[in-house]
UniProtKB/Swiss-Prot annotation:
GO terms for cellular component: nucleus. Gene3D superfamilies: Transcription factor, MADS-box. Required for the formation of intervein tissue of the wing. Acts in a dosage-dependent manner to suppress wing vein formation and promote development of intervein cells. Might play a role in the proper formation and maintenance of the trachea. Residues 167-225 form the MADS-box domain. Residues 81-107, 317-331, 345-354 have a biased composition (Low complexity). The keyword Transcription regulation applies. Pfam families: SRF-TF (PF00319). The gene is bs. GO terms for biological process: apposition of dorsal and ventral imaginal disc-derived wing surfaces; branching involved in open tracheal system development; cell differentiation; imaginal disc-derived wing morphogenesis; imaginal disc-derived wing vein morphogenesis; instar larval development; open tracheal system development; positive regulation of transcription by RNA polymerase II. This is Serum response factor homolog. PROSITE patterns: MADS_BOX_1 (PS00350), MADS_BOX_2 (PS50066). After germ band retraction, high levels of zygotic expression are observed in a distinct subset of peripheral tracheal cells distributed throughout the embryo and low levels in somatic muscle. Expressed in the future intervein tissue of the wing imaginal disk from the third instar larvae until eclosion of the adult fly (at protein level). It comes from Drosophila melanogaster. It is found in: Nucleus. Residues 23-166, 270-360, 418-449 are annotated as: Disordered.
Length: 449
């Protein structure tokens, strides 16, 4: 490339031919190892040329102008300029070394040696003039500043040290923000429904869950045995009655939190056998099929639920009692003792037919001892101590447990007994009290208001 052309990068104060090299002769530049070995770096190039006479070669492309340029190299004024350039170059070199020590990962903008400059024709004269040195120095500072500033932003972590907040413990109090409250309700309602399904599926237990939103919607989940509590008309009325009732006053204080071990277990209980547990997990079993558990448990559960919710005693007690009679009548493979209808008179309790005592106000249903054989005596005593059952002592010394039922439940039991049992129940005229054991076991008796 001819340095005398119009490119400003090659408008130099001297010619490359003054140091014995010509850009038009690449053989001397690359083919002579002696020149390559003895070539000084660009930093000390001008200093070594101070007392050396110039070696000129014929350069037809350069023409005549190199002669006056070579004369200016040996003038005293030019020598002082060379010293100033050398001092400035040394200072800039020291600054670059300091920057390299502080930021070793940044290698851009550093001054290259003379051998590197000769390998690149376009940058061969960049470090030989004051203008070129200024450009290199400014480029080094600019590059270092431009490359240094974005790095802390890319590698620095967030202010909190984490990308997300993670698990945050919230206060167990009412959420005032409506949007947050609705979002929390939706998420936690879905979660608790899923947990109820998992509990019933994994353990085979009966689960019933009811969630009422503040917008008036009711969401429920129930397994097979507990579905009548939600789907039956009595269950729906009970739910609506409870939800429409005013908020009860807090017993333990308004700020009392629900503990992990309290307010969960109730006094309700039921018996379950091996076949009954298999029946629970069978999806094809119907509600009217009888199992090994005693049919007495249904009225007992009805009475206990009625005791828990006295305001809606009629609705809760009626369907279990009706299903109990239906299950007793439809059981074909298992014969349960028939209910003995008993009327209390002035002369003492006497056994009569079901039809004859239908209109008596103080009539009672008494289960025989065989029908309650599956109920543990300990459980009965616990129910008596809790107040769910009532114990009455008769004249003969036997103790009877009575379960008060409403008039609606009594009429249902009487009508079902008349249609299902017929004359079979009237044929059994044996008093139930005579079946009591020697240690006077507890006997369940149903008493109507």
């Amino acid at each position: 490339m001819d340095p005398t052309r119009g490119d400003s990068r090659y408008n130099l104060n001297y010619s490359m031919s003054s140091i014995g090299l010509s850009l038009a002769d690449p053989a001397d530049m690359y083919g002579n190892p002696a020149l390559g070995a003895g070539r000084p770096p660009s930093g000390g190039l001008l200093q070594n040329m101070g007392g050396v006479p110039p070696m000129q070669r014929p350069n037809p492309a350069a023409g005549a102008p190199p002669a006056p340029q070579c004369q200016t190299l040996h003038s005293p004024q030019h020598a002082s300029q060379q010293q100033q350039q050398q001092q400035q170059q040394q200072q800039q070199h020291q600054q670059q070394q300091q920057q390299q020590q502080q930021h070793p990962q940044q290698q851009r903008g550093l001054k290259r040696s003379g051998s590197d400059c000769y390998e690149d024709h376009h940058r061969s004269s960049g470090g030989l003039t004051l203008q070129g040195l200024d450009n290199v120095a400014s480029g080094a500072v600019d590059d270092s500043v431009d490359n240094y500033n974005p790095l802390p932003n890319k590698k620095s972590p967030p202010a909190n040290g984490k990308k997300t907040k993670g698990r945050v413990k919230i206060k167990m109090e009412y959420i005032d923000n409506k949007l947050r409250r609705y979002t929390t309700f939706s998420k936690r309602k879905t979660g608790i429904m899923k947990k109820a399904y998992e509990l019933s599926t994994l353990t085979g237990t009966q689960v019933m869950l009811l969630v009422a939103s503040e917008t008036g919607h009711v969401y429920t989940f129930a397994t097979r045995k507990l579905q009548p509590m939600i789907t039956s008309e009595a269950g729906k009325q009970l739910i609506q009655t409870c939800l429409n009732s005013p908020d009860p006053p807090s017993v333990g204080g308004g700020d009392q939190r629900m503990s992990a071990t309290g307010f969960e277990e109730t006094e309700l209980s039921y018996n379950i056998a091996d076949e009954d547990s298999k029946d629970d997990r069978s999806p094809t079993s119907s509600g009217n099929e009888s199992d090994d558990s005693s049919d007495v448990e249904m009225p007992a559960e009805a009475a206990e639920v009625a005791t828990k919710l006295p305001a809606s005693k009629t609705e809760v007690s009626a369907p279990p009692a009706a299903s109990c009679s239906a299950a007793t009548a439809s059981s074909g493979h298992k014969t349960m003792p028939a209910l003995n209808y008993q009327t209390d008179t002035n002369s003492g309790p006497s056994t009569s037919t079901a039809a004859g005592g239908g209109g008596s106000a103080d009539s009672k249903y008494v289960y025989s001892a065989a029908s309650i054989a599956n109920i543990p005596q300990k459980m009965l005593r616990q129910l008596i101590q809790s107040g769910h059952l009532q114990v009455h002592a008769e004249e003969d010394g036997n103790q009877y447990v009575t379960i008060p039922l409403s008039s609606t439940a009594a009429n249902l039991i009487k009508s079902n007994k008349l249609t299902a049992s017929g004359s079979g129940a009237s044929g059994s005229g044996t008093p139930v009290k005579n079946d009591a054991s020697a240690d006077k076991p507890l006997t369940i008796k149903q008493e109507f208001d």
